Amino acid sequence: MHQYHKLQVEAIYCGTVIDHIPAQVGIKLLSWFKLTATDERITIGLNLPSNKQGKKDLIKIENVLLTEEQANQLAIYAPYATVNRIANYNVVCKRTLTLPESIANVFICPNSNCVSRSEPVASGFIIKTRGKQIHLKCKYCEKVFERRAVESSNLK
């Protein structure tokens, strides 16, 4: 296995680095979790070489610090990602993610009859795991969906 010592994406002075995102998931995280809702510079590395994963994605957001809750929501799609807080070009806090119990205002319920699709209410799901599978239970219609079904209903 090759050791990669070259910096693939430019370092940032201050902000957040989301590392070890599964390849092909980085852009989805930017969209679903509204990580681009800032005027700060965002650097994205896609399909970067990784000793552990083979390939990975990477997101760097300057001058933006994610809360623990925001970071943990990413675990739904990037369970082994790390969220690093950067100050003066150094990692000052490295956080591994924990799957949250619930998630709100991120995804739309796939059930076309769900009240959350027709009424001005915030969407919300309770997160359940079955083995390694992640399922989301809508807090309104109480239907349980595989993660992929919720993902598909949110593609534009």
From Swiss-Prot:
Gene3D superfamilies: Aspartate carbamoyltransferase regulatory subunit, C-terminal domain, Aspartate carbamoyltransferase regulatory subunit, N-terminal domain. Involved in allosteric regulation of aspartate carbamoyltransferase. This is Aspartate carbamoyltransferase regulatory chain. NCBIfam families: ATCase_reg. Belongs to the PyrI family. HAMAP family: Asp_carb_tr_reg. The keyword Methyltransferase does not apply. GO terms for cellular component: aspartate carbamoyltransferase complex. Zn(2+) binds at residues 109, 114, 138, 141. Binds 1 zinc ion per subunit. It comes from Baumannia cicadellinicola subsp. Homalodisca coagulata. Keywords: Metal-binding, Pyrimidine biosynthesis, Zinc. Contains catalytic and regulatory chains. It holds the Pfam family PyrI_C. Its cofactor is Zn(2+). The keyword Iron-sulfur does not apply. GO terms for biological process: 'de novo' pyrimidine nucleobase biosynthetic process; pyrimidine nucleotide biosynthetic process. GO terms for molecular function: metal ion binding.
